[in-house]
Regions:
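Caspase-like (clan CD) cysteine peptidase catalytic core
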Residues: 2-29, 33-95, 156-158
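Active-site-proximal C-terminal subdomain of hydrolase catalytic domains
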Residues: 67, 75-171
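A short acidic, often aromatic-flanked loop/helix-cap motif at beta-alpha or helix-coil junctions
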Residues: 1-5, 120-123
């Protein structure tokens, strides 16, 4: 599955089929892990369903690989949403959320990642309607609750601003 995931990223998203004005949204729900490198730095991974724990290095996908793929895409906006334990190691903080900032930011290229938990956090699997708490709240946000300024658009910044406190309130 690792190879299929990476092939889909490279063959369908990081090639000429994705144009400079496109927007890409990628959602992953599954397992994640953190490994400490020899340097002492932690590295986050997503773990495909068919991964063998004995073959972690070749079966898991490092968050740095995902960041590199996102940077290689021509698309104007790329957002990865990760519902996995320890996925926060792929996270970079966003900036201010004023509406003028958001309008200006929409004109620029952006790479964003929203994660279910921090670098050292496990996340709850059991939530409403058979989803994890994170995914359930994410679906509510995408259905409209995440449009915090009421302009009819849900930005990555608005999504994060809605999801984080809503997940905390539910879990």
């Amino acid at each position: 599955t690792r190879n299929n995931i990476l092939a889909a990223f490279h063959d369908r998203l990081a090639d000429d089929r994705t144009g400079k004005n496109d927007r890409v949204f990628v959602f992953f729900a599954g397992h994640g892990a953190t490994r400490q490198l020899a340097s002492g730095r932690d590295l986050g991974y997503i773990i495909p369903v068919d991964s063998d724990p004995k073959e972690f290095a070749t079966d898991a996908i490092a968050m740095t690989d995902i960041q590199n793929i996102a940077e290689s895409m021509q698309a104007k906006h790329v957002m990865f949403v990760m519902d996995a334990c320890y996925s926060g190691l792929g996270l970079t903080r966003g900036g201010p959320s004023s509406s003028s900032f958001l309008r200006e930011n929409a004109r620029r290229s952006a790479r964003q990642m929203l994660t279910a938990g921090g670098a050292d956090q496990q996340v709850a699997d059991a939530g409403p309607n058979g989803h994890s708490v994170f995914t359930w709240v994410l679906l509510q946000a995408l259905a409209g609750k995440g449009d915090l300024n009421g302009d009819g658009l849900i930005t990555g910044t608005e999504l994060a601003a809605y999801v984080a406190p809503a997940v905390s309130a539910v879990s």
